[in-house]
């Protein structure tokens, strides 16, 4: 079993129950899924760029990404409806815990001038969104093989009802929030 999942079941559930007085163990918020999205605007001109990005996203998450397509045409961006413009991965279960563990303990500390992630990125429903400026912070990405620095959005979806509960859950998981 994953070390983060074990920590959640053995320590975090009891401390959250104590803090927020939940009636049962099932009421304790948990992490439902993590969505990693990479928007690739250059894919409009050059489709090869997309393959490289998909490859990198697969290396980072350990799961094959789904290619996202444009919902509508936008002439200003030379974009037609149905054109591939990005890739996303939805992680659940074991892979989700593996990814979160790696993100918190290895990747985020590798960010330059890192002072912690923003406390303001909660959406009011207990979900947290995090933007990563470069894919190089992940240990699976080889610096020499990178053709272009790409960023990504990481959305952590929890079952928490409020932002306060979600913040407490993520803090105990080890998410380094700003002081």
Swiss-Prot record:
<dbReference type="InterPro" id="IPR031310">
    <property type="entry name" value="Ribosomal_uL5_N"/>
</dbReference>
<keyword id="KW-0687">Ribonucleoprotein</keyword>
<comment type="subunit">
    <text>Part of the 50S ribosomal subunit; part of the 5S rRNA/L5/L18/L25 subcomplex. Contacts the 5S rRNA and the P site tRNA. Forms a bridge to the 30S subunit in the 70S ribosome.</text>
</comment>
<dbReference type="GO" id="GO:0019843">
    <property type="term" value="F:rRNA binding"/>
</dbReference>
<dbReference type="Pfam" id="PF00673">
    <property type="entry name" value="Ribosomal_L5_C"/>
</dbReference>
<dbReference type="GO" id="GO:0006412">
    <property type="term" value="P:translation"/>
</dbReference>
<dbReference type="InterPro" id="IPR031309">
    <property type="entry name" value="Ribosomal_uL5_C"/>
</dbReference>
<dbReference type="Pfam" id="PF00281">
    <property type="entry name" value="Ribosomal_L5"/>
</dbReference>
<dbReference type="InterPro" id="IPR022803">
    <property type="entry name" value="Ribosomal_uL5_dom_sf"/>
</dbReference>
<dbReference type="InterPro" id="IPR002132">
    <property type="entry name" value="Ribosomal_uL5"/>
</dbReference>
<comment type="function">
    <text>This is one of the proteins that bind and probably mediate the attachment of the 5S RNA into the large ribosomal subunit, where it forms part of the central protuberance. In the 70S ribosome it contacts protein S13 of the 30S subunit (bridge B1b), connecting the 2 subunits; this bridge is implicated in subunit movement. Contacts the P site tRNA; the 5S rRNA and some of its associated proteins might help stabilize positioning of ribosome-bound tRNAs.</text>
</comment>
<keyword id="KW-0689">Ribosomal protein</keyword>
<dbReference type="GO" id="GO:0003735">
    <property type="term" value="F:structural constituent of ribosome"/>
</dbReference>
<dbReference type="GO" id="GO:0005840">
    <property type="term" value="C:ribosome"/>
</dbReference>
<keyword id="KW-0820">tRNA-binding</keyword>
<dbReference type="GO" id="GO:1990904">
    <property type="term" value="C:ribonucleoprotein complex"/>
</dbReference>
<dbReference type="GO" id="GO:0000049">
    <property type="term" value="F:tRNA binding"/>
</dbReference>
<protein>
    <recommendedName>
        <fullName>Large ribosomal subunit protein uL5</fullName>
    </recommendedName>
</protein>
<dbReference type="InterPro" id="IPR020930">
    <property type="entry name" value="Ribosomal_uL5_bac-type"/>
</dbReference>
<keyword id="KW-0694">RNA-binding</keyword>
<comment type="similarity">
    <text>Belongs to the universal ribosomal protein uL5 family.</text>
</comment>
<dbReference type="InterPro" id="IPR020929">
    <property type="entry name" value="Ribosomal_uL5_CS"/>
</dbReference>
<keyword id="KW-0699">rRNA-binding</keyword>
